[in-house]
């Protein structure tokens, strides 16, 4: 009887040690959400406001640039003269497909499939690089057509908005490649899939932001942009930013 009690105590002690180790590997906040995941959500929320401000400023400046063009004023090309919707649609499709491969990467590590993880992370990073290559080509094409960062207010707003998004994609690609390297060294176990999930949250956010940018920058016609831009300008004035 005493031996059975001792065995139960040992098992209970081992369970407590394992439970403590699990909490050490995955620290949780008071909300029950992993603290790293919570921090990522907070970062994405602040980044969402950042991009919202950039998009609103773009809408205002694009409307101003088009009005100056119609009045025979201003310098350099304006949106309807230079934006290539078919070409950018391909880039948008490439980035959207990278969200699918990111989901497959997470599913692979949750099944303990290290090779699948590396394959799909590599595919996601490759699609990100293709998107960045397309963005670089677009930037150089615009430059050769006379549109630069300081050419006019449209150029300034366009390159600032899309440039910051491109920087976010670049950070994401570097993150994905680092996960591949860690996986090759045996550092991403099945019970550490949260590391991949957090990277996936960031990557999906970058994709969603591009959908918004693509819709507002490339697809919405000038008269609609002017209306939205005027509303955004009025909003900035109401909160004291205009």
Set out the residue ranges of the language-model regions.
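...captures the hydrophobic TM-helix bundle architecture rather than a specific catalytic motif
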Residues: 1-242
